[in-house]
Amino acid sequence: MKSTDRANAEIQDRLTRTTPPMDVAIAEKLLLEVKEVMDRLGVQFFLRQGTCLGAIRDNAFIPWDDDLDLGVILGVNGFAEQSIEPLLGAFRESGYYVRSGSSDSLIYATLLKDNIRVDMLFHRVIDKQIYHWPGIWFPVTLFNQLKEINFIGETFLVPNPPEEYLRIKYGPDWRTPKRFGYAKDVVDNVPAEHISGFLERTKRSIAGFFYPGNVTRLKVLDNDGSPVDRANIRIVGLGSFKTNKQGYAKLYLKTKGYSSSIASGISDEVGDICSIVVSYGNHEEVLYEEILTPNRSYVYQPDPAQTEGRIFVLSKLDLP
């Protein structure tokens, strides 16, 4: 890796883990620059997630937003998977550092310029749906006829109707600005995973026996550092798991037909970014972004000084 690429990768990783608010003036300049490149190459894209939320609700960037969120539907207007690399090459020529990868449901590219991240997803249509992290499947009808809006003095496209898109993503209270509490709204709005029956438990046992490399272990500790028995660990979009008396839960991350999360893009980590809800007794915490790697062990412990808004807090646990 070139020294400049290594430096950019480190900046991108730091911004991903610490999520500082964007400089709004720079974000506006880059969004217009991205639009110019996409329009020049004839690529139809739309504003998604936080960028769409700010544009529709506030007609402005959300003050604490940390990146630009854009989407492209593969197969629209002749844009296919083989068109992605030439597009990313155009961004490299425009001075962007680009990192890309894929999951079952999408191809992603994270662009970096002037300390601003642009999170660009190229969505595959699967069973007339497209996937949004964490575990949300949208009907493709929301993207068949994108809606034009005026934002920062230009015309942009958003899902249509945008209100329905935002309701599915953020819940019925999407019009209320929330810096931290929105994460619980999002995960609560993801349909519950039907995985508690005997058949599913049997599938997990078989999967763990034949594919032990896919099993991840998570140990849950309470405030005093003691293991928690029967804590519930929900991997949003995938399933729920219980800890044993030693505080450990076995997580089977690859039991569904579609990937439930997207590859991390963190340069020193190979794994999936997941949303996790840890609950026991009167305690519940949403960890909106965590990296889980198959065949690794992690430990969770609450922080009484910060009860919401934590990300990337799971510690790796080295077992004998």
PLM regions: where:
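Conserved catalytic core of two-metal-ion nucleotidyltransferases
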Residues: 16-39, 87-134, 147-156, 180, ...
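Active-site nucleotide-donor binding segment shared across nucleotidyl transfer reactions
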Residues: 35-68, 73-77
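Short, conserved charged micro-motifs
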Residues: 77-85
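A conserved mid-domain beta-alpha-beta active-site/ligand-binding segment of alpha/beta enzyme cores
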Residues: 141, 145-146, 151, 155, ...
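A short, Gly/Thr-enriched small/hydrophobic beta-strand-prone motif that recurs across taxa
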Residues: 207-225
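Short, ordered, surface-exposed loop/turn motifs in non-cytosolic proteins
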Residues: 215, 224-237
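Short, acidic Ser/Thr/Gly-rich low-complexity loop/linker segments typical of extracellular
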Residues: 238-258
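Compositionally biased low-complexity segments at domain edges in trafficked proteins
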Residues: 302-320
